A protein has these predicted regions:
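The Walker A/P-loop phosphate-binding site
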Residues: 173-206
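Short, small/acidic-rich helices and loops at N termini and domain boundaries
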Residues: 1-11, 48-57, 122-183
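Short hydrophobic alpha-helical runs that function as membrane-insertion/retention elements
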Residues: 74-77, 111, 136-139
Length: 206
């Protein structure tokens, strides 16, 4: 790794488009990452989206592989991780979306399984905004788990499947569901409408 100024043992994540190797990301045991200089920005495991109508997007390669262990094949990872909430200019960081747009044209459901920290939430928001919130679903993890790999290690494959099965449709501004107003409706059912303002006329105020 040139970042460390020395050779080191690494995991190599190979990025393919079709049969063409377009990029390689290296990761050592200290979680230092490096990509091939000049490599193209695409999703990891992009070929797995061929002929799919649903997909899962993760924040890292290990998370994508964790879902694969749980039995999901239609999983990809972004190449550059989460997005710092303080950074304003992020277009170049999301170039992979433009480079892979054809793969998402026919997607009906897109599960956003990013990390639950601030950079992961920012990434999720940007992905939903660009891919279309009406077809995006938020994947949430159990308490104490930051990402899909945490869930797999701590709870196993079945729990990771539950995370997908219980995913929530991305909230769309201006649209409300009955469940969002459950407490208000229950109060209205049990207590009725509140009394209006007094008019001062007893016949009207009854």
């Amino acid at each position: 790794l040139s970042q460390l100024g020395k050779e080191d043992w690494c995991i190599c994540f190979n990025y393919y488009v079709g049969e063409i190797l377009t990029n390689i990301k290296y990761r050592n045991s200290q979680k230092v990452f490096q990509q091939v200089k000049g490599g193209s920005k695409v999703f990891y495991k992009l070929n797995d989206l061929e002929n799919q109508t649903d997909c899962i997007i993760t924040e890292g390669e290990i998370d994508a592989l964790s879902f694969e262990v749980a039995g999901f094949q239609n999983v990809v990872s972004v190449p550059d991780g989460g997005i710092n909430p303080e950074v304003k200019q992020i277009q170049t960081k999301l170039d992979y979306l433009d480079n892979c747009s054809e793969y998402f044209k026919n997607m009906h459901r897109i599960y956003l399984a990013t990390d639950s920290d601030a950079p992961g939430i920012r990434l999720r928001e940007e992905l939903a905004r660009r891919l279309g919130k009406s077809r995006c679903w938020i994947v949430r993890y159990p308490n104490g788990c930051k990402d899909a790999n945490d869930v797999l290690v701590k709870y196993g494959s079945n729990k990771l499947k539950e995370c997908i099965n219980s995913a929530e449709l991305y909230p769309i501004e201006g649209i409300h569901y009955a469940n969002d107003r459950r407490d208000e409706l229950k109060d209205l059912y049990e207590n009725g409408f509140p009394n209006g303002a007094k008019s001062g006329y007893s016949n009207l105020d009854e």
